[in-house]
Amino acid sequence: MVRIWFLAMMLGLFAGSAPAHAQDQAARCAALEGGALAALPSAATYIVKAKAQPASAERQAYCAVEGYVNPTDRFGMYLPIDHWNGRYLVRGCGGSCGSAAVELACGRHVRDGYACLITDMGHYSTLVDNTWVDNNLMGLVDFGYRATHVTTVAGKALVRAFYGKAPLKSYFFACSTGGRQGLIEAQRFPEDFDGIVAIAPASLHPFGGVKPAEVSDIDAFNTGPDDRPILPNRKALLIHAAVVRQCDLNDGVRDGLIGDPRRCAFKPSQLLCRTSDTRSCLTAAQVAVVDKLYTWRGAEKGSELNWIGNYLRDATLPGEVSKPVFDLAVGRGDPVVTETMIAPNNPDLRAFRDHNSRLLLVQGWADHSVMPPPTIEYYETMATTMGGPAATRNFARLYMIPGMDHCSGGEGASAIDYMAAITGWVEEGNAPEYLYGVHPLPGAPLDYFGIDLHRLDRKWYGFERNHFAWTGPGKTAVSKPTGVTTPVQPVQPLGATLTQAITEADRLGSASGYSRRSILSGIEKAIWQTFYQAGADDAAQRAAVAAIDRTGLSPVALEAVNRMSAELALD
């Protein structure tokens, strides 16, 4: 018979100082299974699985827990067995959520000593499946705000039950839908967290700039009479190069990044073809498509490489398009649901501030999915509401990252240690004037810091930048206050670099649970961006694709390579 132990009994059993031996903690982990936590009167919590995981070469031992909060809020949690740093971390999800992917969310954090939790937000689905919304008001409530809060409270109860004491500090860290979760927590449940990192928060549409729209509309205006795209992937490289040539130095630094796209006066008509040779220019129809992407869609100057696989469909796949996730309720024409349950648009954070909590709000300038204007406008509105920029910066700061795509990726320095920044601010009072990040080498895993280091100074109104250079591990650091060094690239043929980029894009997409189509788009994007970084012309592109080592590539990666070969064969 399943044992049911209520929280008071568990606390009585597990009270006291941390055990001297990991074996005792492993036994405590197993004892959690089958328990029930009365953490909230209206949110009973049940632990369905708890098992100690032994230490390995990659991490120390930890307790893996699975449970749910009534009615359907599933969560996964990792608790370090003998190396807890005293902190509790909740990770958010992406898109439509629907999966408590605890290893993906918490694996690296438990290695650093965090007790870490993630929830599925109350439903089963893929990242882009919104069918769960139909006739599911409770599901919308959970997705909107309840699930994050009740599972956060449950996680704190588990920390106390397992370690015999409450966490010293509690943090939230996530992007996109997860960024929305973070803002909702600051607005609705200001005492849940001491520090929140909210990156590219979704569903801030009511604050302006970009209205939700179906991607099929983009597909429609980019489809010609022959059912092929008017603006193919390869033209994104041409447009991006023109934007960089014109606007790179607007911030005083030649680094291939657009520091503030609002100051870039590039117009697509500048690339209008003057002859019948259209390979290095834009036709009138292509100019019209680019204009719509900048104005109707709201894409920023400098984001062009991130259109590949997102706005621009492959020439060999008529009628198919990768669909980013948009605001669920707005897309269904229900603004009441959006305002009350989904949109994190309340600028009044007095309770969060008075709890002495801190907020890092982050947005990539080249984000293809969550456009920068709503994030900027939300912060500016918050600053006005909270007594002005100076008063707001005491507890909440906005960081705009040049060249960064949605959550990460792109050409900017998107590999950033956000947890070091937020814990330093919360626990030591070191408000981060800068975020330090790197742009990994093509094909490198996300935790490889092997390229020039960018120091990004973010002021809420100006988004100014300073830089210094770091040439990579084992290399001599060269300080350049007004610029950065040329990235250190591996000495290998372009085909080998492409193989690495394809393999890494495939790995990341598969690990994140993306659909086949999304993984395919990610691989194509990696190929084109590698071409751009290498400055490869048409002949070099064809040769590089032909030289890709196909041994060991997955079926989806092979399909991407075949499609790229077909596209490069077109005029």
Please provide the spans of the model-predicted regions.
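A catalytic-pocket lid/entrance helix-loop region that shapes and gates access to the active site
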Residues: E185, E191-G298, M400
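Glycine-rich nucleophile elbow surrounding the catalytic serine of serine-hydrolase chemistry
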Residues: C175-I184
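Short, solvent-exposed loop/turn and secondary-structure capping segments
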Residues: F75-Y78, A100-A105, L127-T131, L183-R188, ...
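Alpha/beta-hydrolase fold nucleophile elbow
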Residues: K165-S176
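C-terminal subdomain of alpha/beta-hydrolase-fold enzymes, centered on the catalytic histidine
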Residues: Y294, G298-W460, H467, V491-L498
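Catalytic-loop region of hydrolases
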Residues: A22-R87, R91, A100-A105, H240, ...
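Cap/lid segment of the alpha/beta-hydrolase catalytic domain
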Residues: G95-G164, V210-K211, S322-M341, M400-D405
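Bacterial N-terminal signal peptides
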Residues: W5-G16
